[in-house]
Amino acid sequence: VLGVQVMTDPRLREQGLGAMEGHTADELEPLPQPTGVHPADVRWAGGESLADVAERCHSLLDDLAARHLSATVLVTHGDTMRVLLGILDGRSHRDLDWDLSLTNGSVMVRNVDLGKLH
């Protein structure tokens, strides 16, 4: 409709939550935090860690930078968006902005030179 190319990429999928998927927070029992490991590096209930999500987000951004696109719109999910915003703002997956309100349909805008991320 707008004359733009639409592409899908599995690296933009939501964080995999393993055995916790399909359950509400009230249905889940709290899991003990492993000693000596940052919570963002834990694969809770067999799912993905935030480190895993950050790895695929870095890969995606590297690929986008290599394409030298003038503008890109990314559509993704909550935790993945939070990780992407953290990367674009120069933060680690261990230091994400959990106070940032990301509701369904949120639009976040960043003007970034992807070639300068590293």
Tell me the role of every PLM-derived stretch.
Residues 1, 63, 67, 87-91:
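Active-site catalytic microenvironments for nucleophilic, acid-base chemistry
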Residues 1-33:
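Phosphate-coordination/substrate-recognition cap region in phosphate-metabolizing enzymes
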Residues 7, 91-117:
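Domain-level recognition of soluble alpha/beta enzyme cores
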Residues 33-52:
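Short glycine/proline- and acidic residue-enriched helix-loop micro-motifs
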Residues 54, 58-66:
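Generic structural signal for well-ordered alpha-helical scaffold segments
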Residues 68-78:
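Generic beta-sheet signal
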Residues 83-84:
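Phosphate- and divalent-cation-binding pockets in alpha/beta enzyme and binding domains
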